[in-house]
């Protein structure tokens, strides 16, 4: 969501929520949802999400500890700061009000620059579902390491459940690079190119679904609002057990 800054150069969180309302998904994974400087607060304020009423953030309860590590002599003061972020390294998961949150976790990924992923274990009706939101590196080598780390983290989770990975993989290829790490356990939703929003030619954004789940439909949301809201178009998939 490009920190809520659209192609017109304006930061407009209302526009982000308008696009989410158009898509009307039960579960949303956002990238670049938090600021990179200062307290790293959310670019879509908590109060705005609450007043909008459609979604609730999955609260990870973590702080960006690297901010504090770089200023250890001020750590006591900094730890009192409410960062007001909704994610981890910019990754956030929003769910509709009827979706239950069983557990969640923030992952620190191997990287040369700050990168992370978020895990939410959810309950939709009687059906459990694990969702991973991610934003992988620009480097192909580090993307593969990061995807491997995410899959290993999933394997370590105490509860086994169907899993969907969503986010910006930064992978231009369809059957190579970090996607080879999936080893046939997952399949890619046929969403289509989502980058750049002005003229989408690259399928950088992916919805990756475990083979135990079915993909009923998938695509790219290409409304006028979506084309203005970010440099990436949102993608979607309808998944069933």
Task: Tell me what each language-model feature is.
Residues 31:
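Residues lining the SAM
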Residues 1-27, 35-42, 50-51, 55, ...:
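Active-site regions of metal-assisted phosphoester/phosphodiester hydrolases
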